[in-house]
């Protein structure tokens, strides 16, 4: 069994894969203060919840955009599973060509998302990831990543809103019942949701304006689910996209 780990700024997402089948996935809060033992205990518990043990894990692949966490997490894998993880980055074959000014600056999570989208749904494809940051990456029909787009994630924007104002409360990030809000909380929810949704749709429109060939839009990320019922500009929602990409990358690097 392959264990795939996405270490993001807000969450660490762990998936267990039997071939192409995802047999379990778990999400925990990213904390730089967690020790390797704490991460190891969490991994052990997640394995047990999926009716597995450490002996069932044959290999581990990791995407990380948080270097401070990577050190202790890697140590937990070595101590509790006896495995040195494959880390998506320089020296690892991804199967994707990257035509950016500086390919090294493209996050490993974005690369895995693009690999998952291209090798699952084909190209050309615009890959949207709604996480701590919102990213769009365009992959052409040959599997080449040709552009990147980065902006604030909806939760990051929301935290700035209530964190930088004296009287606005923290609210749940969710789809409101109506844009016609009647109190402060629902007004904030409507404002955040529809402003962000409008930004998503306008961004996709601009990509379509500047790209000569038709393409599909594949969305992923923890908050993509709240937009799926309110726009027809996204073709596919795939919460497991990064796991699919990591599994593909792993397959290209093992004999």
Swiss-Prot record:
Pathway: Cofactor biosynthesis; coenzyme A biosynthesis; CoA from (R)-pantothenate: step 1/5. K(+) binds at residue 129. CDD domains: ASKHA_NBD_PanK-III. It is found in: Cytoplasm. The keyword Nucleotide-binding applies. It catalyses: (R)-pantothenate + ATP = (R)-4'-phosphopantothenate + ADP + H(+). InterPro entries: ATPase_NBD (IPR043129), Type_III_PanK (IPR004619). Its main location: cytoplasm. This is Type III pantothenate kinase.
């Amino acid at each position: 069994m392959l264990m795939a780990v996405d270490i993001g700024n807000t969450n660490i997402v762990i998936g267990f894969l039997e071939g192409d089948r995802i047999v379990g996935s778990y999400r925990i809060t990213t904390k730089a203060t967690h020790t390797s033992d704490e991460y190891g205990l969490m991994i052990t518990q997640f394995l047990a919840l999926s009716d597995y043990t450490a002996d069932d894990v044959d290999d581990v692949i990791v995407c990380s955009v948080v270097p401070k966490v990577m050190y202790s997490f890697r140590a937990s894998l070595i101590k509790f599973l006896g495995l040195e993880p494959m880390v998506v980055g320089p020296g690892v074959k991804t199967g994707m060509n990257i035509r950016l000014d500086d390919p090294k600056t493209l996050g490993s999570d974005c690369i895995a998302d693009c690999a998952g989208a291209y090798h699952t749904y084909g190209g050309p494809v615009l890959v949207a990831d709604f996480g701590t940051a919102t990213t769009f990456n365009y992959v052409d029909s040959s599997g080449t990543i040709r552009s990147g787009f980065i902006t604030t994630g909806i939760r990051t924007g929301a935290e700035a809103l209530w964190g930088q104002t004296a009287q606005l409360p923290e609210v749940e990030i969710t789809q409101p019942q109506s844009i016609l809000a009647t109190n402060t909380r629902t007004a904030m929810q409507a404002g955040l949701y529809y402003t962000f949704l409008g930004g998503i749709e306008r961004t996709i429109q601009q990509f379509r304006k500047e790209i000569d060939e038709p393409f599909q839009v594949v969305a992923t990320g923890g908050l993509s689910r709240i937009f799926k019922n309110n726009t027809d500009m996204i073709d596919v929602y795939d919460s497991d996209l990064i796991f699919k990409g990591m599994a593909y990358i792993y397959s290209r690097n093992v004999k």
